[in-house]
């Protein structure tokens, strides 16, 4: 009985994923990094003239505004950038 109870507790902790943190791609999409506390968005920055080639990727707290030369795409799920 104790083994069953202990198993249920362990499964519950694993399923809750305590301390969840966001993971965002770095510039090279194969590599990702865990975002620090407070950085709850992933972003991808690219030049408007070359929209298929990202210049920068990472974690950010607030999505920056686009300009005439630079565009930002932000999202909030793991490796969405």
Swiss-Prot record:
Protein name per UniProt: Cytotoxin 3d
Signal sequence extent: 1-21
Major localization listed first in the record, in broad terms: secreted
Classification lineage: Eukaryota, Metazoa, Chordata, Craniata, Vertebrata
Complex and partners: Monomer in solution; Homodimer and oligomer in the presence of negatively charged lipids forming a pore with a size ranging between 20 and 30 Angstroms.
One GO cellular component term: other organism cell membrane
Entry-linked Pfam families: Toxin_cobra-type
Gene3D superfamilies: CD59
Family matches, as InterPro entries: Cytotoxin_Cobra (IPR003572), Snake_3FTx (IPR003571), Snake_toxin-like_sf (IPR045860), Snake_toxin_con_site (IPR018354), Toxin_cobra-type (IPR054131)
Tissue and organ expression note: Expressed by the venom gland.
Cysteine pairs bridged by disulfides in the record: 24-42, 35-59, 63-74, 75-80
Family per similarity comment: Belongs to the three-finger toxin family. Short-chain subfamily. Type IA cytotoxin sub-subfamily.
Compartments, record wording: Secreted; Target cell membrane
Swiss-Prot/TrEMBL keywords: Cardiotoxin, Cytolysis, Disulfide bond, Membrane, Secreted, Signal, Target cell membrane, Target membrane, Toxin
Any GO molecular function: toxin activity
GO biological process, one term: killing of cells of another organism
Keyword S-adenosyl-L-methionine among record annotations: no
Role noted for this protein: Shows cytolytic activity on many different cells by forming pore in lipid membranes. In vivo, increases heart rate or kills the animal by cardiac arrest. In addition, it binds to heparin with high affinity, interacts with Kv channel-interacting protein 1 (KCNIP1) in a calcium-independent manner, and binds to integrin alpha-V/beta-3 (ITGAV/ITGB3) with moderate affinity.
SUPFAM superfamilies: Snake toxin-like (SSF57302)
Transmembrane segments: none
Keyword Nucleus: no
């Amino acid at each position: 009985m104790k083994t069953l109870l202990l198993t249920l507790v362990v499964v519950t902790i694993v399923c809750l994923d305590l301390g969840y943190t966001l993971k965002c791609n770095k510039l090279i999409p194969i590599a990702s990094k865990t975002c620090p506390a407070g950085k709850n968005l992933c972003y991808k920055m690219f030049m408007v003239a070359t929209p298929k080639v990202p210049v920068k990727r990472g974690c950010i707290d607030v999505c920056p505004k686009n300009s005439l030369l630079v565009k930002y795409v932000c999202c909030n799920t793991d490796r969405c950038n």
